[in-house]
Design a protein with these regions (language model features):
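Flavin-dependent oxidoreductase catalytic cores
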Residues: 1-286
Length: 286
């Protein structure tokens, strides 16, 4: 008996020619199973091997940071250099079993790091959290221009190590109010230099991160992004700006775009826009 192939079973060919064996994607989650030094662990290997052997086409790792001084939560894996290359290779081997694409999501929390976890928090601008969150999150220090450029380089260097370890792609975390998302947002980014102001200048950090990763990994290595459809926050990143950003990324050669929404102050990704206002049904379904 012939069983018709569903669209979920069909391979997906990305713009750079890489093929995902089916349309099933495990989106990034923050497993917090890294060591104190930021290395992946056997627990992560077991988890990702189980997902790979389950038949998923693309598995995206959760919340891998590019700076040990800037953790989003305890237990984050961190890639600053090749110090943990052997552990990363073991993780990649597990995650790419069974013909699975396994991509590393690279991130920097910016201001969204709990008090006491890091020496200080940094962001595009020194914009405090709203009053009911100030007990949990400190007001960040605004990054200098030199620090912004250094962070771009960190993303590129981390991506090169990801490829060296044997992972098959990278995803930029550009959603949920983390650093890339903060640069995109007119609420969080009040800069008047080349990194802020107009929508084009606010997305410059993202575009430079993308270019640094592409330079470090080459044309054949898939690069994706997790991007907010909107921040769902007054004065934040809008749907129109999101569409313009998608067009800019598509023109630059991005391979895959995953849409989400919200920030810690307006957590639409959890089904709630704010502490009092439910998100739309379409957001909850995402």
């Amino acid at each position: 008996m012939h069983v018709p192939q569903t669209i979920l079973d069909q391979p997906l060919t990305l713009p750079n020619g890489a093929v995902v064996k089916n349309r099933l994607l495990k989106s990034a989650m923050s497993e917090t199973l890294g060591t104190r030094e930021g290395a992946p662990t056997p627990a992560l290997n077991r988890l990702y091997r189980a997902w790979a052997e389950g038949g998923i086409g693309l598995c995206v790792t959760g919340n891998v940071m590019v700076d040990l001084r800037a953790l989003g939560e305890p237990g984050n894996v961190v890639i600053e250099d090749a110090a943990h290359l052997a552990a990363l290779q073991a993780w990649a081997k597990a995650g790419t079993a069974n013909g699975t694409q396994c991509w590393v999501q690279l991130n920097h929390p910016g201001k969204q790091a709990p008090r006491g976890l890091n020496h200080e928090t940094v962001a595009p601008s020194a914009v405090p959290f709203r009053d009911d969150l100030k007990a949990f999150f400190a007001t960040p220090r605004a990054l200098t221009g030199a620090e912004v450029r250094a962070l771009v380089a960190r993303f590129g260097k981390a991506a090169g190590i990801v490829k060296q370890a044997g992972f098959t792609g990278v995803q930029i975390h550009g959603a949920h109010g983390y650093l890339v998302s903060q640069f995109l947002s007119p609420h969080h980014n009040l800069r008047t230099d080349e990194w802020g102001g107009s929508p084009e200048k606010r997305r410059r950090f993202l575009m430079e991160v993308y270019r640094a990763i592409r330079k470090a990994t080459g044309a054949g290595f898939p690069i994706g992004i997790k991007l907010n459809s909107a921040d769902f926050q007054r004065g934040g990143f809008t749907e129109e700006e999101s569409l313009d950003t998608i067009r800019a990324l598509a023109h630059a050669g991005i391979d895959l775009i995953e849409i989400s929404g919200g920030t810690y102050e307006s957590p639409a990704m959890t089904g709630v826009k704010s502490g009092r206002e439910p998100a739309r049904e379409s957001t909850r379904q995402r």
